[in-house]
């Protein structure tokens, strides 16, 4: 809402005080934070999002030598167009009886985006089998391109809110446009050999070029190889219960180009200066940032061993993979440069990363005779884990604000909390923690957080290096561990049910979040009931008790609370936007971000054949489906646990619960 000068985002609800009312007795919107926000959302304008997508795929196949050699081609074109239209209107606020005023501004904002994506694949495939030998191979060419165009225009002071048009406005106009795009071009090949259905060898190779890298460093070759051995086909393997027993191993390299489209080109931005020349703010151009000559593909080399087992007539399947993945030349900010340089470090192939992990999948499928009909059912469980560590980076001092050798990806450095201060004497005799005071101006008092002096120097400090971390240490890790998924399904007499659960078994999360801290962070933030569990040193006096409402007393707010979740009620005490206590993670408020979510449930029914055949149809299925139905997590009251990304705050709109009713008809 920057055009209208108002704030009407969903985020603003978090800042509302619980005492802010939204409507006056006469039904008009109140002149309060809640009233103005509600008026903006209901009367302050319209937003239309129009989205059109077109996609087509052409395929061509020619069997040059039937059952031996074929030529294939496919081309896909996808075009997406998106139009955003914002029309901002004034809204009415009741200041008193018969005193209704219009507030806000009028504005029109038009935003147009076009996406075009194209991919072309040309390849020849060869298949040949004789006696116990089977050969197959592919050689081909691949080309992809993506183009994005954007143009937006805005203008203020619309003459009539009933005619929201750019040409019917008197205010200042702001227009901008942008373009970005990328392209990939390469050749690829694969050769596969199988002997007696028990020895498997495969070789792969790609030679790819990306427009995201400089011309001289645009192409890279990425080979791989894999082996497989079906032990169950060997004469010495005689285990009736095991239908398949297969060992696998692979080694290969892939290229990663997940960087900005033109990151290798020095770019300059334009802006209007804050001073006037001839009554105009002059246009200025910023100095270009630095780019590095060491800027090309990340090379990701993977080593994998695996095991596949099938039991009970292949009803029960088990898959296990163990892998090590080395990323060489990871594209990230390079070595820290002197601050007097006046610009930040450029992205370059500056770091190496090693990831070790494993994946397990168990699948069971069967059908039984139940009440004279077949009941089929299945279950699948997947579980995976991985940890990543920096193995190379030019940071000899091991500064904590950059990668360093031995750093675990996602590690959280923080302070240790030693309870709350319980007396002024304890404050006086404790280590100096003034550097942790937000804004340097909020007094430490009874009920304030007490930090532990880990290094014993008598001062609570945040260090800067691994060797000198001050009173900080690694207290957790924000990376997701033990990702799991559970699929269940069954079919019986035309009914089918599928459900899916997913989750994360371990993840740490520090709440840099307004909902968690509320008025403990900033005095104008909103309040929630969990925030009332703050430190209170003693019961209120009888005189103070007599002035409290019964509700206040019943909630325990007049009683001592020394074993509280939050510190003493003190504005700015836990401000996360400063160098102080709130902005530095600590172990007391480190939360468990593991979760289990009921992701999907679908119940369907296929109409009997005699009914649909009489209608000239081949199949009719009706279904009811729900998504994001329920979740179990310690943090679900403040953020959506699935929306929490690595080192992210999770301060986004949560995943919505969706319900749908539909019908599938086949003719």
Where are the regions a protein language model picked out?
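Conserved small-residue
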Residues: 348, 358, 367-478, 509, ...
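Long, compositionally biased low-complexity segments
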Residues: 475, 486-487
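Short linear motifs in exposed loops
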Residues: 33, 463-464, 500
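Extracellular/periplasmic, surface-exposed regions of secreted and cell-surface proteins
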Residues: 1-16, 20-24, 28-88, 99-416, ...
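Extracytoplasmic assembly/pore-lining segments of large envelope/extracellular complexes
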Residues: 92-93
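Short, well-structured alpha-helical interface segments that form or flank functional binding sites
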Residues: 479-483, 490, 598
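C-terminal beta-signal and adjacent terminal beta-strands/loops
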Residues: 240, 327, 389, 457, ...
